[in-house]
Each structure stands twice: as structure tokens, then as C-alpha cells.
Amino acid sequence: HASTRRLVLQGADAVAFIADSQVSETENNAASFLDLRANLKELGRSMRDVPLVIQFNKRDLANTRSDAEIDELARRGKEPVFKASAVHGQGVIESFFGLLDRAWRKLDAEHDLRQKLAIGPDDFLAKAAASLGYEGRARELCEAHVGGRRGQ
């Protein structure tokens, strides 16, 4: 798995770190996050250089971290944190749009996408939201997180 993760990270424009909300998975989440950092470092990349969102999934299960605990973790970090239950479809599209927002803004800063493609980040996100059936909700989707800053 480690070699596959490194290969995927090598060409990644952004990363969604999916953490398990169950308290019993706290150590595994921490180990996976440290592994992500180490893999990026091996590739000559830094956590600061790669747009990142964190999603706490499995919010529907028992014995999960409380919203207050996740909110506190989010306040301590720079990355936006999304709460989700993938099996119920909650928080998934929001996590995606949070990541899409950060990725677009980073790529725009590096490659001047706004000029080359004649579309700014807000219009790009609005079109993406509309194409997925979320007309007029791009900003709401991007901002459905705790912690972090939009587009950073």
C-alpha cells in the first residue's frame, strides 16, 4: 500500500485525508496522517505545498468523536475539516467542493488558469456545482467546514 500511496501522491494536485471518526481509530488516523506527511517529504513535497482537506467520516456510527472534539481539532489546524457520513451521502460533496476550491486556487496561482481559461475560481466552482445538480450552491458547499480558510 505504501508504494501505491507514494505513486498517487506524486502526481496529486490536492489531497483529501479521510479520517475515521470512531474514537478507536484515533491512533490509526494519526499514523496515516504522519505517513501522508512522510510520503510527501520523500517526494520532495510539503504539506504546505499541497492543497489539503480533512474529512471525518463515519459520523453515523456509535463511539465517534463529538462535534466539539472535531471542532477543536479543526481550530488547531490550518486545513478545513469536513464532517461526513459517506453511507448516508452527508458531507461528501461538501468535502469534494472544499478540495476543488483549494486545488483550483493553487493551480490558478501557479499556472494563471483565470487568464488561460477565461474563468475565475468562483465561476468555475459555480459551473461545477451546477453540472452536479447543485445550482447556486457552490459557496455553501465550499464553506461547509470547520477550521481552515477558504481557498488556502
Question: Which functions belong to the PLM regions below?
Answer:
Residues V50-V53, D60-L113:
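Canonical P-loop GTPase G-domain recognition
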Residues H1-R5:
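Switch II (G3) loop of P-loop NTPases
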Residues D35, N39-E42, E72-R76:
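A short linear boundary/processing microfeature
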Residues T26-S32, D49-F56, V87-I93, Q115-D123:
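Low-complexity, flexible helical/coil segments
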Residues R37-L40, G44, A103, L107:
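Short, well-ordered alpha-helical segments in soluble proteins
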Residues G11-L34, K41-R48, R59-T64, S85:
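Conserved Switch II/interswitch segment of TRAFAC-class P-loop GTPases
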Residues H88-Q90, D101-Q152:
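C-terminal-of-GTPase-core extension/linker across diverse P-loop GTPases
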